[in-house]
């Protein structure tokens, strides 16, 4: 197992870091850590060390419910030793921290509530400017099960088998100038985004795809990667079975 060098400063360089890897045809993995579900600093240190050592490319920090600013800062601080980016995955404007390397600046494109499409972003923008957090413009699109994120975000979820609609959203995001499209099946979803949807989208758009939700095995992750997913996100499996998460990361990084 290769231990990677620590303490490379990434503030202001996260988008370049990610794009350089993608341009080298790497497939990436993000580890989603929910501060609300972390029971102790010892647990977080153990999980983070193992995920880092097998090659996860970034830590995403965030959750839909129960995350305070203090807990967010605490988790980011504990991850500070690792050279990979610490990226905020915000559910609302309370999840902003100057300690992070970057922020996914999300717009929930298929929400029926304008607040989640552009309202929260307007409120957050001056704060982000003041805190000098690097932003990564990302279209967030919820598919299938959707979970808590769909409920809170009032999303009109895209059916798992409606490839044309998912492609239309992806193209809209590309034309709006987004850097990424994040297709989300929802935390703990009974099934992930279908590989057929990803390959269908990739025939029409070259925008990098982040895929998350319902990914519980290396076999599923590899099918998504083979279909064209650029970045795989796992969260629940990290909390439930870190050894399975490690296998997923190894599979993706050895692809």
From Swiss-Prot:
GO terms for biological process: glycerophospholipid biosynthetic process. Mg(2+) binds at residues 34, 64. Coiled coil: none annotated. The keyword Membrane does not apply. Its cofactor is Mg(2+). CDD domains: PcrB_like (cd02812). The keyword Calcium does not apply. It is an enzyme of class 2 (transferase). GO terms for molecular function: magnesium ion binding; phosphoglycerol geranylgeranyltransferase activity. Keywords: Cytoplasm, Lipid biosynthesis, Lipid metabolism, Magnesium, Metal-binding, Phospholipid biosynthesis, Phospholipid metabolism, Transferase. It catalyses: sn-glycerol 1-phosphate + (2E,6E,10E)-geranylgeranyl diphosphate = sn-3-O-(geranylgeranyl)glycerol 1-phosphate + diphosphate. Its EC number is 2.5.1.41. One of its GO terms (cellular component) is cytoplasm. Sn-glycerol 1-phosphate binds at residues 182-188, 213-214, 235-236. Pathway: Membrane lipid metabolism; glycerophospholipid metabolism. It is found in: Cytoplasm. Prenyltransferase that catalyzes the transfer of the geranylgeranyl moiety of geranylgeranyl diphosphate (GGPP) to the C3 hydroxyl of sn-glycerol-1-phosphate (G1P). This reaction is the first ether-bond-formation step in the biosynthesis of archaeal membrane lipids. Belongs to the GGGP/HepGP synthase family. Group II subfamily. This is Geranylgeranylglyceryl phosphate synthase.
